[in-house]
Amino acid sequence: MPIWGAISSNDLLNTYYTIEESQQIVEELLDFQMHNDQLEYFDSIEDAKKRFITDLYEILEKKHQKTNTFQIVSPPSAGKNFFIETVLAFYWNTGVIQNFNRYNNFPLMEAVNRRVNYWDEPNFEPDATETLKKLFAGTSLKATVKFQKEANVQKTPVIITANYDKFTKEVWDDRIIKYYWYPCPKLKEYNKRLHPFAWVYLIDKYVTDLLILIKMYNHRVMGNKICNLIKMYKYRVMVINIFSAFICLILIFLTNNYLGPGLYTCKSIDETTLSEAVVIWPSDKVTNHKEVFQADKQARDEFFTSFVHIGNVHSLIGGIGLGTKNLVEEHVLGKPLYGMGKRKSTEKDWAKIKRINRARAARRENQENQPDIREFGHVAGQNINADQEVNLADFPDFLQDFDAEAGPSGTQPVETAQQSPPTMSEDIQPMETVGATDTGGGAQVDPRTGGQAAGGSEMGAGGSANDGREDIFSGAPQPNQHHTLVYGKSYHFTITKWFTEFRHLATTNSGYYAQQRFKHIHGIPWERLLMYVSEGELLRMFRDYTSLKVEEVVCEVYSLGVRLPFVTSATTSSVANANAQYPIDVFHFDEAYETNYGINNVADIINKALGTEWKNATRPTAPVTTAWSEQFPNISASSTSRDINNPVIVDYSLPYFENNVPKDVGIYDYVDIKNGTTAYGKCWEKRFKPTNGLLYAESTLKGNVVTPLAAPTNIMTPIPGLENGYFMSNDQIRERRDLTTSVPPDALTATKLNQSASNNLNAFVDYMGYNYFGEQKAPQSMPKFMIGFVNIRNEDNSLLNAKWDILIKTRIRLTGLQSTREWVARTDRIPPQYFTSQYTQFRYPNINDTPLLRSLGTFKLPTKRPGMDSRIALGELQKQRKMNL
């Protein structure tokens, strides 16, 4: 038995794993690395592994005319060298390619007369491109050897491992087969090398279709002895053919078996009686008998050549079998023993290989350059490149243990109707400079610019504009700064269940309603900004930015298991089995029905998320050190968990004096159900891009008084970016060709001047709005995230109680506009980058109308049904108003 890289035969097991251990480890490694390729290009991981091993095998056995190189690209600790060194050890005669640079005149010196050449972390100068093209294509070339004459490098397979792909141009696609691997944490557990015979195992399993009568006898020493014996004969081919025929006759008469492709039905030969096997090698792409004979001879010679050079007993067995087959067919029968049949072509689709290589490279580049916001921990925000566009839909998912949220069609896509405009940029809309001034018109001029209009294309003598990364000179107007901010939070909650309730509600303004409240379905208030940021982060954003806009949010639900009651004394007739599979589910029937939930329940969840029950509720008037306590104001940490109690309400409008009622809500038409007993880890995910995610913006459309309705300016100001020419004056907004007027929209819900502690804490990710000025935009808003149970009853109709532990993980991406000079944009007007298309979302007929007040009622809670308010009793609404005041 060879010792390969071991110090001695006694040290072999200290250096290499056993063959069985190596087989298991290499399968685990390939399962991990082929998983990503399987998701994109193959039907299963087995197909991906088969393609990988086949590609490597065909390169090593020189099966391709032009493609002669196999490359694995990966970051460190991916296992590429761990795997490739095993393959190279199997072939023994391995050469090393050195880097091509001015300091090395003999890069191919060690690559002459080798079975396979290896190049780790390649680096080369452009002058070596033509040489490498020949080397990678298997074309013969000359190599300079130190202190010797030039040598000839024949077609020799090349194996490359690299951390970065240096061969990205199209010229290499026909010469190199590339695979991209990923860091494998489990490699840290392995302290030995893989046994080289693991490569034989992989070939037998994933490449060869040979009919093996018994297990191949792996012994290189015996193979070398047989090789030397055969070399002694002058006519070794004739001797081998005679010996092959003799072995074949013995096998046929002793076992009474028929050897043929696709017809092998005999029992296995006893391994104790024979140590060798006859193997049938099928020929490919032949059209007549003569080509069959020629293909068999060629394959036979390749087997014997392999045996002579590397002592592979498998090759000897294959050569013997093919020699016997050819002798009988050509000289006895005169025709192939098994018929022609249809042989599968091994011609490769190079166009597809190019596409796969490019897709793998693009995916790897995207993975390296685009961070997934779900992987961030507790961060205070991240200032990314101002012009960088972040698209979460393009990011790879590393947590796919469970399916994403599914609807009736099986998938729940990102809300494409909610696509926001591109990330803020100076190129979207130039700063409006021709507007009203205190003289009634004309360009805005600042003396520090040397007489030029602020924000104009040319700067005056006072200084020159820059991109914000250069020195700031006195008097030079600076461009706005756009920052991308990423925040994230994680929460541990529990969900309980109860029966559904109903009632009739007489409202004061919109008629008569019937309501259902599903107490086993609860809403996650992911529309609230404070589910993503802390109070301090929110205040810092309001302090640091002129205006702020939500670009995208992500909310994930992880299941920690459903806890069922432990029944000890009840009978089976009254209580269901405590080990029952309790279903958990996510609902999205808000697509078809008007839904809402109570603002007090939402406030309770937000308080628990912020920790106000222990930070603020019991804080004394004077600073004092208190004793440790387990009794929290809202929950008892020693006995119960943090419940989400936010049942979803469905509203049905009922006409007066009519008895007909609308259809009952089909909640199970819009549900994705999982087994709560076995579902652990990530269960569902929702992503959303707000239509109107503007949190606030400073504006001079308001006075200096912080009131619910600040006094507008007396200056007529055009709304920038609107083609129809809307104008604002003292108390009116009007269109140039329309006499209809109304109170000017002071952007109350999104104006920094009007921020207060109460409405800051009630900020929403998306403010739905309805256009009143003819814009062709469908009213849309943020969908609800509703999770819960399917109720299970006992035989006596009582409810089988359960408690569901969940983790909620949220991430938010915002863009902030920071004006660098007050006279440029900070207090001049609403920044046009936001309001070119979104400004009409704030045009309500009456600015004093309740929907604009953030902290009142539940009418701002998301619904996909336009024109529907929350139906709260008048007394509850008045009580809520008093609390806010």
UniProtKB/Swiss-Prot annotation:
Cofactor note: The endonuclease active site can probably bind other divalent cations.
EC number: 3.1.21.-, 3.6.4.12
Kinase among keywords: no
Biological processes annotated in GO: DNA replication; viral DNA genome replication
Catalysed reactions listed for this entry: ATP + H2O = ADP + phosphate + H(+)
Biased composition (Gly residues): 452-465
Residue numbers spanned by region Disordered: 404-477
GO cellular component, one term: host cell nucleus
Enzyme class: hydrolase
Cofactor: Mg(2+)
Protein location: Host nucleus
A GO term, aspect molecular function: ATP binding
Biased composition range(s): Polar residues: 409-423
Alphabetized UniProt keyword annotations: ATP-binding, Covalent protein-DNA linkage, DNA replication, DNA-binding, Endonuclease, Helicase, Host nucleus, Hydrolase, Magnesium, Metal-binding, Nuclease, Nucleotide-binding, Transcription, Transcription regulation, Viral DNA replication, Viral genome packaging, Viral release from host cell
Pfam families according to UniProt: Parvo_NS1
UniProt family annotation: Belongs to the parvoviruses initiator protein NS1 family.
Protein task: Multifunctional protein which displays endonuclease and helicase activities required for initiating and directing viral DNA replication. Also plays a role in viral packaging and transactivation of several promoters. Binds site-specifically to 2-3 approximate tandem copies within the origins of replication (Ori), unwinds this hairpin region and nicks one DNA strand thereby initiating the rolling circle replication (RCR).
Assembly: Homooligomer.
Comment on protein domains: In the N-terminus, the endonuclease region is involved in binding to the origin of replication. In the middle, there are the ATPase and helicase activities. The C-terminus probably contains a transactivation domain.
Record-given protein name: Initiator protein NS1
